[in-house]
């Protein structure tokens, strides 16, 4: 498991000896929030992005919101961001810590700046460290609204506590935006309409789809499509990554 860049290098190095590789790489998950979603869907999705300081490959960093509740979703996301504390890991309490390195911190800062430069609305957070933290690789929980699909923050894996919120008109547009990415690890659906959820889940080009906050159980295969990797870990599918097929004739 690692970045898509690391996965490409591993694949190239394995090619000379024709080694098989199982890659679980980056992601740019979409979280499709319909007007009939449960009351906690928006806050749950935002917290999922900010958890682990955003350093999760399956984080739902693109929140797609049905237009009729877009303003409500934006306000809830801003509230969650403003109430998410950032502090050192040794401090007791409910807060998120720093990102892993200066390289990652600098990358996140550049991508936040790119969102500003490309015209997205910075609704919460922003560049530089949170107030009161003058050193360390701490990133402000950041919310961008009015994001366009062409922007870098909508396409590149940021791997930090940064969420982009985009509106959609109908199912078809939501599916199109969700699939318009080089990645395909995990997508999310929020709706009380089970038939709609099932219909959309079948059309999403990702290795995993989570519906209404129901996490995956132990033994389920974990992995993605496209530049999110190949192969699976977990359950019987994970074990099969280590097996070879053998054909034998004349056995009986």
Q: Could you say what each language-model-derived stretch is?
A:
Residues 2-148, 211:
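ALDH superfamily catalytic-core signature
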